[in-house]
Structures are given as structure tokens and as C-alpha cells.
Amino acid sequence: MNYEIPAIDIAPFLTGEPKGKAQVAAQVASAAETIGFIVLSGHGIPQSLIEKAFEQGFKFFDLPGEKKAKLHPIGPAKQRGFHGLATRGLSATIGKDAPKDLRESLFFGPIDDHAAAFAHIPDAATAYAPNILPDTPAGFDVTLVDLYRAFEKLAANLLRIFAVAARMPEDHFTPMIQKHFSIMSTHHYPALQEPPLPGQLRTGAHTDYGALTILAMTGANGGLEVQRDGGWMPVSPPKGALVVNLGDMMQRWTNSRWVSTMHRVMTPENLHDAMSRRISIGYFMHPDYDARIECLSSCKGDGAKF
């Protein structure tokens, strides 16, 4: 079967007009059942904010390695601060042995301090660990907070749309995201100065384990690819659009009616793209640490799998 990534304008849903909400929900349901990815417009996030984050992000990653290394997390808080080039590999999450990914990253977590609410759960501490913010370039820390808030609002709206698309009350997910531990990550894919190792990608093949992911991307070709029917197809959103994909949690919520799809970031094959660098910023939506991830009542059918 030949798939394409559906392009969906969610503005008609956000305006609140019943017909528009129904149309958007139907489009989202179709995309969620077939490919699990959406090219999203009408999201309301200013392009100027995204471009500012890209610009400042490039400046941050241009800093000397020893300065960036000062932001590396100490202890178990793995989703905070700076992580250097080829120090992490996402293919390991699916049990694949491959070289580490050709990217460096800056991770940023919840702004609101919810750690006390989950102090009784030993493993929750890392989910609500303090952020490690850069002080260079000037204002980058403020931009990160502003963009996190914008993604946070969009994710809440998307969950409203997803609820309607899954034939649930619009506010079904809302109580589950009041103390979320969503992660925002800025990934820098530098120009390749030498050939990659065999099997080494910019980001190895994986699925996202949260509820949903929002991605802003820019830079050279040879980027995001989505797997369907054993093949891979590129995702190249137009300027101003975002990419949204479902995570494993949403697949469980919907009893596997909706799909969390394998994806990767390829290493460019042609010299021009390989010598160009790119940056992406992803927001990985995770509900409250104690949220129950169980089959939605509308998706049980002949029985819940989860």
C-alpha cells in the first residue's frame, strides 16, 4: 500500500465551530489509524518563535565542547541538559545494536515543579528533575521556556482533538496532564566531516514511548523518515508546519487501533547535504506520572489488549 503523510489544518477545531471540529477529528482519526503521523498547520505557534529557537540553538551548539559539557547532567536525570555527539543511540530502544547517533542534544523538562506531588514514588524523581539551562547565547533560556509553553498549550489542544477523534469526551485526557513531565529536546545534526560508521544514522530507528510528539525541523535534506510496509518515506513539512506523531502510550490507549510508527533520521547520502547541518526541536508529551494508561472505553471492541 502507498502511504502519504496527511496534512491537517486544525484551526477549524480550535475555533470551536461544531462542523469544523467534526471534520478535523475525522481527519485525525484516519491519519492515526493508518500512518500515525500528521503534517500540522493552523497550530497557532508563531513561526518567529520557532525561528528564534533555531537561530539561538545553532549558536549554542557552536560553543566550545568544554562549555557545553558543563551542562551535562549529574546523576540519574538523563533527560536534562547537554548530551554530546554520538553519546546516545535510539536504536537500542528496539534492541538493535548500532553505532551511537550522529547528533548532540539539549534536553529540557517541565517548568512547573511537580516533584513534591510524586515524592512517594521512588522512580518519579528523574521525571521531575530540575532543568539545566544554558546562559549562552543570551536569551536562549527564555526562548526555551517560551517555546516549551507554546508546545505545552498545543499538546493540550491536540489531546482534545484526539479525544473527539477516538469518540471520547473532548476533555477526557485533560485531568491526566495537570502534572505532566513532557520533555523538549533540541537536536543538532552537525555537518559530517568524515563518513559515518556502518549502520550509523543521525537518529536510529525507534518509536516514541509517550502520548504524542510535536516536531519543528529545519536544515538540509536527508532528515526524518517514516517506516511503512517495510519501506521508508521522507517527511518534509513546508515552512510553518509542524510534524506530529503518536507515541506508544496513545497506541495502548486506543487498543492498537491507532499506530505508533517507527521512524528515523537518515544520514545524508549526497555530499552537499552531508556537509550541511540541521536542527530540530521536539516536544514529547508525557501525561502525569500516575496517569492510568488503559484502553479507552470507545476502543474496547471484543476486549481490551492492555
Residue ranges and their predicted role:
Residues 1-306:
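Peripheral, non-catalytic segments flanking oxidoreductase cores
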